[in-house]
Amino acid sequence: MKRIFYFIMSLFILAVVFSCKDSKPKSVMSQTGEVEDSVSTNDSTIYGTMVDGGMNSIILLTDNGDTLEYLVNPDDTLEVVKGGKINGDRFAIIGYKEYGDNFMRSAINLTSLLGNWSSLDRNFEIKEGGTVTSSLQSEKNPWTSWKIWNGKLILSKDTFDIENLGADTLSLENKAGIFVFTRGT
């Protein structure tokens, strides 16, 4: 009887040892083998291409392949679409759902954001793919990368709200103040 008891206990211990073998925490890796960007993992922004729209709406073909219609809330007092609406342009939209419809809290025309921007102390180019190049050698802490995260523009380590994005003007605001840039050549 003791042999059966010890035999069953040894089988139980072996089962526990083998079942715990693979319980080490695994590092979070993307399919490409790179560590996931902690900033992009909590991004609530919807990215896509505008396929149609009107005065108060944008129909967006998202990067996931979905087609979504976003409306401008008639109660909004501020302009929620920054950079204009042109079919075929890339957009970053922060939205919310109300009464079964998708509404825009903010929409940034990424195509309008690309290009050369300059001010008295900065002269830079925002390029596709998240890179920024600076034209001034004397510039302190030049921006080298950009991304949109939760409706905010991140230039290297600086985070900005886009106050205005027009054909020739870009106004950015953060805790240090408002920065106005004009379209360069």
Residue ranges and their predicted role:
Residues V16-S19:
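C-terminal motif of bacterial Sec signal peptides marking the signal peptidase cleavage site
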Residues M1-F5, D22:
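Positively charged n-region of N-terminal signal peptides that target proteins for export
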Residues F5-I13:
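Sec-dependent signal peptide hydrophobic core
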Residues K21-Y47, D52-T185:
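Lipid interaction determinants
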